[in-house]
Amino acid sequence: MKNLVIFAFLFLSITTVINGGITSKFVRQALPSIEMSLDTFPSPGGYNTPEQVHLTQGDHDGRGMIVSWVTPLNLAGSNVVTYWIATNGSDVKPAKKRAHASTKSYRFYDYSSGFLHHATIKGLEYDTKYIYEVGTDKSVRQFSFTTPPKIGPDVPYTFGIIGDLGQTYASNETLYHYMSNPKGQAVLFAGDLSYADDHPNHDQRKWDTWGRFMEPCAAYQPFIFAAGNHEIDFVPNIGEPHAFKPYTHRYPNAYKASQSTSPLWYSVRRASAHIIVLSSYSAYGKYTPQYIWLEQELKNVNREETPWLIVIVHSPWYNSNNYHYMEGESMRVMFESWLVNSKVDLVLSGHVHAYERSERISNIKYNITNGLSSPVKDPNAPIYITIGDGGNIEGIANSFVDPQPSYSAYREASFGHAVLEIMNRTHAQYTWHRNQDNEPVAADSIMLHNRHFFPVEEIVSSNIRA
């Protein structure tokens, strides 16, 4: 009994519980988010050596992979990826195949990019490790990836969740903290990648350094990206009037496979998850292309095959931080009822440089006569995760609204990442890991219950540590 009292005292001393929610009193040490210098991740040595190698899903169902890389010169053979099934020490000689990349480059103000190669590999076997090589002659570089299991309702799969990463020393902690978890198989990235636009004239060299920084992870497992505000790069005053130019040149996706008309909104299916990516910074009003696409996309979801329905959108619809408070409100008003009616499990956002998890709530009952304008608990609603805590140069958003709203279940002003471990059609373990802890430590965790197959209330476990 004495130990129980001591535990309760310690727990309450480092948390604040308001209206059922928890505000962690853990605040990241008040140090600036110092950006790594341009030479922290130099180009690899050798002649025309590929760099900034990264992966994303290359089709709708996980049998395709887009392999991307950059070379200084566009020489013969530099646009080819060679790949084969890993034989794990077997004497059987693997059958090697080749895929040719589309190659492009771009100019931005006074910057000229290298040659950006994007090769789509199709017809891969499910749940199989592949070796792949890019480059020619003595500049060949070798990597590997593993395809997801075949689509199915009880297929286990583990996603990392990262947002607003940037390229500071804190960003480095976040990425390598995630990489130390051997379970991670693919990353859901909630927008704001390089933060090149935080530098004079949107210094495009920062896109190159970010690509090199990410390569140890992104060359081995695919990233499913949403675009954030730091990807807009709309600067007409320096002659750059085309939004998302660097982002779309460097980070393509298979948007046409989901009948989208834009790479800024699309969907993929992976294992037992159906993932929908939306754009906070593209038109979404009635009858716009994104609106029309999402309306049809939600009808296309087959929960019998992919029970876990996840939406990624950069600007959060529910956020109790003073930073960017209610910026996502107009998009929420437009689409929230669709997500509730479709029983979306999880909505992932960034933008706010802190961590927050909501209750299952909705605010869709309002009409001009009833005045119902506050969020209420709703078992059909998604849980909203704000994961803009990757570590970028702009630092932590440590000013939460007080008192904590009832819709906010847990919030904390520190850097970190999350992991979603799907177990089967009914259960998935969600954990959030702050950078200051060892990887196995989960500062916030919840066993999610699938809204389609097991729509019962979840039990929360938050382990708050000073």
Curated annotation (Swiss-Prot):
InterPro entries: Calcineurin-like_PHP_ApaH (IPR004843), Metallo-depent_PP-like (IPR029052), MPP_PAP (IPR041792), PPA-like (IPR039331), Purple_acid_Pase-like_N (IPR008963), Purple_acid_Pase_N (IPR015914), Purple_acid_PPase_C_dom (IPR025733). This is Purple acid phosphatase 6. It is an enzyme of class 3 (hydrolase). Specifically expressed in flowers. Binds 1 Fe cation per subunit. The keyword Hydrolase applies. Its EC number is 3.1.3.2. Glycans are attached at residues 88, 172, 367, 424. The keyword Signal applies. It comes from Arabidopsis thaliana (Mouse-ear cress). Homodimer. It is found in: Secreted.
